[in-house]
């Protein structure tokens, strides 16, 4: 069962919907044990390296030597010569999407201080950007910022890393993965 303090949920009901939280619960039930295994293996590898072991390629030469390819990127992101990365605040998203860059990557990990307010406001901002309803009025000078109608910058999202938990959302009393939460809210 998912738990979120009611005072933390009430301001973000537009994104913390039943569908989003049900999706989060499914992701956690499906992938949490694998995530924990990955984190344990990462810790073991770090201990091994710290003890003097050298890195080496895994014994999967067949994959590296095989003749395989990946699907080409969609045409609208095939050219990524200019890419901006930044926090998920409204003004930054608007300016980045209006910049003419090929891609703006909204960054929930390194560019955003991980407070509940910043993270949830960021989710609201992405929802509004995807629906082309993102506006911001600067409280200092009352200047209004809005998405240009002709903006064609692609919006990418970098969720928090798999190693970061979100203590504000619990399943069975345990914090959920920040990455799982970010992806669940973006997905819906």
Say what each PLM segment does.
Residues 186-188:
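Conserved small/polar residues in nucleotide/adenosyl-binding loops
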Residues 78-89, 165-178:
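Active-site mouth loops of central-metabolism enzymes
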Residues 13-62:
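Low-complexity, highly charged intrinsically disordered N-terminal segments
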Residues 102-112:
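Short acidic catalytic loops
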Residues 112-159:
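A short alpha/beta connector and helix-capping loop motif
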Residues 47-91:
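Long amphipathic N-terminal alpha/beta scaffold segment
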Residues 87-89, 109, 158-164:
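Active-site beta-loop-alpha junctions enriched in small/polar residues
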């Amino acid at each position: 069962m998912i738990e979120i303090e009611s005072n933390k949920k009430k301001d973000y009901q537009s994104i913390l919907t039943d569908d989003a939280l049900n999706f989060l619960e499914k992701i956690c039930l499906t992938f949490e044990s694998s995530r924990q295994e990955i984190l344990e293996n990462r810790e073991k590898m770090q201990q091994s390296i710290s003890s003097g072991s050298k890195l080496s390629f895994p014994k999967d030469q067949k994959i590296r030597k095989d003749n395989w390819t990946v699907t080409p990127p969609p045409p609208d992101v095939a050219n990524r010569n200019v890419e901006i990365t930044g926090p998920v605040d409204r003004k930054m998203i608007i300016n980045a999407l209006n910049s003419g860059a090929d891609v703006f990557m909204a960054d929930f990990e390194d560019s955003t201080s991980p407070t509940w307010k910043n993270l949830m406001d960021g989710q609201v901002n992405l929802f509004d950007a995807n629906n082309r309803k993102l506006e911001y009025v600067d409280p200092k000078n009352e200047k209004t910022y809005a998405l240009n109608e002709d903006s064609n910058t692609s919006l990418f999202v970098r969720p928090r890393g798999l190693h970061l938990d979100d203590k504000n959302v619990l399943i069975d009393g345990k914090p959920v993965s920040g990455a799982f939460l970010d992806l669940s809210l973006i997905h819906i």
